[in-house]
């Protein structure tokens, strides 16, 4: 782990000494468990102006919260989600589904809900309850389908700001996200510089590389070429382009894992005892990818996949400044924690260092941690003692600032 910063260091000693003791929040479950959570559907009647020039008139956002908002509303943390995640950040739903960042958020965890009020928002265009392609169009009553407008990271941030308004939160203690969520956190610091104290960007990038855009295009092509796609209006045909979604997920999943991790998990292990000279599954890694693809195709929406990957492609805050990221971040007022993982080749550490350099060029306070974890891009979702210690120590600093 390497620290590069313009403010007092979060050192290994800080991380080791960060308070890990928390009282049990609810009797009858582990002290660090949030327990059962119930999401809330927020409706917004006021039209949301989109970057593409159109509007969404009347929309819903699914929201989930953890912890207690303090009297001056200074302890709120917004968690922004990645491609296939949702508002369900932590805790457990009634059907048993555990939040996607439950190891990070909760009582006594790095983002301690005994001290912080944490908000998860499902983005517009997603398929987990917020208004998206599966939702009925207000004029026709039929699903939006392909008529749902193309949305961007900036549109999501504007919608999230309305959620903050609904809670009466003028300034977040922190906005945090991993991968695509990290792009949203960065966008928050640029679009609403007075509305967050800290910006936490994990396993992310200030813009996609040509290679990443290419991966997204191949994945979208798999969906668009599926005969069951029907131009995006497959709902009316009572079908789903599962074959395309399956391939798209398989492509994506390869980019989330490191070569080292895949070698350790699968190597060249065969599915059966010997090769069968067929085009069916022969290797364990093939079986794994097919399983992941099949599972994803059952619960995710194809139109949503197209929208979110395109939002990834479009994100480039430096574009309006002649390609200069240094100029793009000049006006931000937040302090930053930027974390990358050495084996992440989807959003390589070089991209995080690019952001760190731009921030330091402007003398903005930034702490940088580069973690030597073997799990590739997915490392941001997994437990790693060094990674979690760094995040814990940073949030300890935030808690001291706001008196949480």
From Swiss-Prot:
Organism: Ralstonia pickettii (strain 12J)
PANTHER family: HOMOSERINE O-ACETYLTRANSFERASE (PTHR32268:SF11)
Cross-referenced HAMAP family: MetX_acyltransf (MF_00296)
GO MF term (any one): homoserine O-acetyltransferase activity
Cellular component GO terms, alphabetical: cytoplasm
Function summary: Transfers a succinyl group from succinyl-CoA to L-homoserine, forming succinyl-L-homoserine.
Active-site residues annotated for this sequence: 179 (nucleophile), 344, 377
GO term, biological process aspect, one: methionine biosynthetic process
Alphabetically ordered keywords of this record: Acyltransferase, Amino-acid biosynthesis, Cytoplasm, Methionine biosynthesis, Transferase
Pathway in which the depicted protein is active: Amino-acid biosynthesis; L-methionine biosynthesis via de novo pathway; O-succinyl-L-homoserine from L-homoserine: step 1/1
Enzyme Commission no: 2.3.1.46
Subunit structure: Homodimer.
Region of interest: Disordered: 1-30
Residues the record marks as site: Important for acyl-CoA specificity: 346
Cellular location(s): Cytoplasm
Protein name: Homoserine O-succinyltransferase
EC class name: transferase
Domain AB hydrolase-1 residue range list: 75-384
Disulfide feature: none
């Amino acid at each position: 782990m390497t620290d590069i910063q313009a403010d007092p260091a979060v050192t290994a000693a800080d991380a080791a000494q960060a308070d890990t003791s928390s009282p049990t929040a609810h009797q009858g479950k582990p002290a660090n468990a949030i327990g059962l959570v119930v999401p809330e559907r927020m409706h917004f009647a006021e039209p949301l102006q989109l970057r593409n020039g159109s509007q969404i008139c009347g929309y819903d956002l699914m929201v989930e919260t953890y912890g207690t908002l303090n009297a001056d509303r200074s302890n709120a943390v917004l968690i922004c989600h990645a491609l296939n995640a949702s508002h369900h950040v932590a805790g457990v739903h009634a059907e048993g589904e555990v939040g996607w960042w439950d190891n990070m958020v909760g009582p006594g965890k790095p983002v301690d809900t005994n001290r912080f009020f944490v908000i998860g928002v499902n983005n517009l265009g997603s398929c987990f309850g917020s208004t998206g392609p599966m939702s009925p169009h207000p004029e026709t009553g039929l699903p939006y389908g392909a008529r749902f407008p193309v949305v961007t990271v900036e549109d999501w941030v504007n919608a999230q700001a309305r959620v903050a308004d609904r809670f009466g939160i003028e300034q977040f203690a922190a906005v945090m996200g991993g991968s695509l969520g990290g792009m949203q956190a960065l966008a928050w610091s640029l679009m609403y510089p007075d509305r967050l104290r800290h910006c936490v960007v994990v396993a992310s990038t200030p813009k996609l590389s040509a290679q990443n855009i290419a991966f997204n295009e191949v994945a979208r092509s798999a969906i668009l070429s599926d005969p069951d796609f029907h131009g995006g209006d497959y709902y009316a045909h009572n079908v789903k382009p599962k074959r395309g979604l399956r391939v798209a997920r398989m492509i994506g999943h390869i980019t989330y894992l490191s070569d080292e991790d895949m070698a350790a998990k699968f190597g060249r292990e065969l599915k059966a005892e010997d090769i069968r000279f067929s085009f069916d599954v022969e290797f364990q890694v093939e079986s794994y990818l097919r399983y992941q693809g099949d599972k994803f195709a059952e619960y995710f929406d194809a139109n949503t996949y197209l929208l979110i990957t395109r939002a990834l492609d479009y994100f480039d805050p430096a574009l309006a400044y002649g390609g200069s990221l240094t100029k793009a971040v000049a006006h931000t007022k937040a302090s930053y924690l930027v974390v990358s993982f050495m084996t992440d080749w989807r959003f390589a550490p070089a991209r995080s260092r690019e952001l760190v350099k731009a921030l330091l060029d402007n003398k903005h306070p930034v702490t940088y941690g580069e973690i030597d974890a073997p799990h590739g891009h997915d490392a941001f979702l997994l437990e790693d003692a060094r990674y979690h210690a760094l995040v814990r120590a940073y949030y300890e600093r935030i808690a001291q600032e706001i008196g949480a």
